[in-house]
Regions:
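Catalytic histidine-centered segment of alpha/beta-hydrolase-like enzymes
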Residues: 192-203
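Short beta-strand/loop motif that positions the catalytic acidic residue
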Residues: 153-154, 159-161, 165
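Serine-hydrolase catalytic machinery in alpha/beta-hydrolase-like enzymes
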Residues: 9-102
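Glycine-rich His-Gly loop
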Residues: 33-37, 109, 162
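Primarily recognizes the serine-hydrolase "nucleophile elbow" in alpha/beta-hydrolase
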Residues: 88-152
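Short alpha-helix in the alpha/beta-hydrolase fold that links the catalytic acid
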Residues: 46, 143-146, 155, 169-177
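Acidic catalytic loop of the alpha/beta-hydrolase fold
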Residues: 163-168, 195
C-alpha cells in the first residue's frame, strides 16, 4: 500500500498542464510522467508511479501531452507528435527549474515513445528514462517497428513491460533494445497486459535502477 506523503497541486503554466507531487523530504531529483494515447495525466498508473517516486523524495510533474490538452478524447495524430515532444521539453524544463538534481522522464505507451524520441533528439533533456509498456509495434503487426530513433538513444533506458503486452513480446523487445547504444534494461511484469494494473510494478527496484545509472 502506498501512503500519501506528498502535497499534490494543479499546475498550469507556460503551456504545461498537470499535477505537481511535492515530497515532504525532497531528494533534489525530479521526474516528468506522461500518459498513453487513450488516456491523460489522471491515469491510475501515473498517479501510483508519482506517489511511489515521492516516497523516495522525487518531485514529480505528471502532465497532459499537448494533444490531450487540445481535446479530452481521441488518439494523437502523427502530425502532432513533434508538438507533443515540444510539450515534453517544456515540462522537463519546468521540473528542472524546481530541483537541484537530475531529472527523469517516464511515460506509458505513447508517452514513453515520445519521451524516448525527445531524448534521442536532445540527449541532455533527461538523466534516465522509464518507458512503461513501450509500443514497439501495433498489435499483430510485428514488422511495423517504432525503433528508428533507437540508434541515437544514449540516455539510460528502463523498459517496464508486461509479459502479455500485445505491442511487444519479451523476445521482440530484447532484439530491438540491442540497437540502443546507451545503457538499457528490461524489467518484466509477469502476467501484465499493455495496461499494467496498479500494484504490479516493483517501484523500488525501478527507481533504484534509475538512480544506479546516474550514480555510476
Amino acid at each position: 500500500m502506498l501512503w500519501f506523503v506528498a502535497q499534490i497541486t494543479e499546475f498550469n503554466e507556460g503551456g504545461v498542464h498537470g499535477f505537481l507531487h511535492l515530497p515532504d523530504e525532497p531528494s533534489g531529483e525530479g521526474m516528468v510522467l506522461t500518459h498513453g494515447a487513450g488516456s491523460n495525466c489522471a491515469a491510475p498508473l501515473l498517479v501510483e508511479l508519482a506517489q511511489a517516486a515521492c516516497m523516495l523524495g522525487i518531485t514529480v510533474l505528471r502532465c497532459d501531452l499537448p494533444f490531450r490538452q487540445r481535446r479530452a478524447y481521441g488518439p494523437p495524430m502523427p502530425a502532432g507528435a513533434a508538438a507533443d515532444r515540444a510539450g515534453l521539453h517544456n515540462a522537463a524544463a519546468t521540473i528542472r527549474s524546481m530541483v537541484r538534481g537530475p531529472v527523469f522522464l517516464g511515460g506509458h505507451s505513447y508517452g514513453g515513445r515520445q519521451s524516448s524520441m525527445l531524448a534521442a533528439e536532445e540527449p541532455g533533456v533527461a538523466a534516465a528514462l522509464m518507458l512503461i509498456s513501450y509500443p514497439l509495434h501495433p498489435p499483430a503487426k510485428p514488422l511495423e517497428l517504432r525503433t528508428e530513433h533507437f540508434p541515437a538513444l544514449r540516455t539510460p533506458v528502463l523498459f517496464v513491460q508486461g509479459t502479455r503486452d500485445k505491442f511487444a513480446t519479451h523476445a521482440e523487445l530484447t532484439e530491438a533494445v540491442a540497437a540502443i547504444p546507451g545503457p538499457s534494461r528490461i524489467m518484466l511484469v509477469e502476467g501484465a497486459p499493455h495496461e499494467i494494473g496498479r500494484g504490479l510494478i516493483d517501484h523500488a527496484a525501478a527507481f533504484a535502477q534509475l538512480r544506479q545509472w546516474i550514480a555510476s
